[in-house]
């Protein structure tokens, strides 16, 4: 290979909010598995010293006890609205584990919670919860609407993490 990186961080992937996850199930599973598969295997070939991949909070069962424990992974059904994305992220994590065992690939899988920050997708239909709610609130305000549509039942607990905090966690994980 022309490049011999010291570290590879798989941050690429197809992401979206509830609407996008429900509508583009095949795209979410195919694109995310393809990205992870190609990069993980390239790291094996290049003998990359360190690889970080990302899982997702949605990898955990829909009815996992809160706060979620790492041990609850793969213990129950996933949230149907983002099952394809969750399965793709689980596949990436398991692939890292298998490549570590068989090929001694030095990898770690970080599982951040819901991210937000600069450059986010503020589309009310395809964005994640914080940016899409911000956009919907803004549109309601400028249009003088008295109501704001919020999707879901309101029952799920969510945690949020600013991308700068994730960056700090990545640096820590690499040390």
Q: What feature does the model see in each segment?
A:
Residues 101, 115, 130-148, 158-175:
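Alpha-helical substrate-binding/gating segment
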Residues 17-18, 53-68, 84-90, 101-102, ...:
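Conserved catalytic-site region of short-chain dehydrogenase/reductase
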Residues 38, 62, 80-113, 132-143:
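Active-site Tyr-X1-5-Lys
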Residues 7, 35, 50, 74, ...:
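Conserved cofactor-binding/catalytic machinery of classical short-chain dehydrogenase/reductase
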């Amino acid at each position: 290979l022309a490049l011999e990186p010291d570290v590879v961080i798989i941050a690429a992937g197809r992401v979206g909010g509830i609407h996008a996850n429900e509508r583009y199930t095949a795209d979410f599973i195919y694109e995310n598995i393809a990205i992870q598969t190609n990069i993980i295997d390239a790291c094996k070939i290049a003998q990359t010293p360190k690889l970080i991949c990302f899982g997702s909070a949605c990898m955990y069962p829909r009815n996992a006890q809160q706060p979620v424990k790492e041990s609850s992974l793969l213990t129950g059904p996933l949230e149907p609205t983002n099952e394809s994305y969750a399965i793709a992220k689980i596949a990436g994590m398991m692939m890292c584990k298998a490549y570590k065992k068989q090929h001694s690939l030095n990898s770690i899988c970080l599982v951040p919670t819901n991210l937000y920050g600069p450059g986010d997708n503020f589309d009310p239909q395809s964005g994640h919860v914080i940016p899409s709610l911000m956009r919907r609130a803004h549109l309601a305000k400028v249009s003088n609407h008295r109501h704001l549509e919020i999707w879901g039942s309101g029952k799920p607990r969510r945690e949020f993490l600013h991308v700068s905090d994730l960056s700090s966690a990545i640096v820590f994980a690499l040390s």
